[in-house]
Amino acid sequence: MKSLLKGINQVIPVTGEKWAALSEAYAKCIAEHLTPETRWLDAGTGSRLLEEDLDALENWLVQRSGMTVGMDIRVTQHLNIRSLVGGSVYDLPFADRTFDLVTCNVVMEHLGQPEKALAEVARVLVRGGALIVNTPNLWNYGVLANAIFSKILPEQWRLGLVRATDSREPEDIFPVRYRANTLRRLHSLLRANGLKVHRATVLPQPRPYFRKTAQVEKLLMTLTPGVRLLVCAHKET
């Protein structure tokens, strides 16, 4: 594994820039599981694989996989994936044991029934197949604030705050639930569905959200945990 990681790090087209740190950490985790034989499902795919504009990195990942399928409630076009399927994570439109790898990038936080979605992921994974989850950490100050705002503010007001710090199009921003967004909760849900965690990392927040409050946020960044949970689990049976 060490030699594989060394090889990946030598060729993977990462920038090493702070603004890209979260996406590049996630991409490296994916790369460790890709071979020319890999059958990969990106569940909740949206219009691209990564959050930042990292076209070369996204193309590199897809080219390393034998088969890549993108699935979402509504998908009309995708930057990198040509095979697109409409469907719900609660009822994946695939046969049992279809995929070697399933990825969920900033998806879990939107699910009202994460346990149901993970049961479906486990169903379509082969034995020994991997699930990689990249999702916000509820205990980070910014994520926790968003969770609180989602409870007390009208959704349109909350979306306005999100858009102030996010480059996504309005149609790509969805309501949040945060029902699987602590390491303890995510571990529990994965274990309950026969998925054993092999790696769990809390990724640090690259920078403050707002320029005007940067000094206060830098203090909060030292007092609260990192912003992102990056978890890799494998199907045991």
What are the residue ranges of the model-derived segments?
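Conserved SAM-binding loop
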Residues: H33, T38-V143, L230-K235
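S-adenosyl-L-methionine-dependent methyltransferase catalytic module, highlighting the catalytic core
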Residues: E115-E120, A130-E236
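Soluble or luminal CAZymes and related metallo-dependent hydrolases
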Residues: K18-Y26, D53, Q113, Y178-T182, ...
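A short alpha-helix capping/helix-coil boundary motif
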Residues: G7-N9, F99-D100, A164-S167
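Short secondary-structure boundary/capping segments within folded domains
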Residues: I30-H33, W60, L220-L223
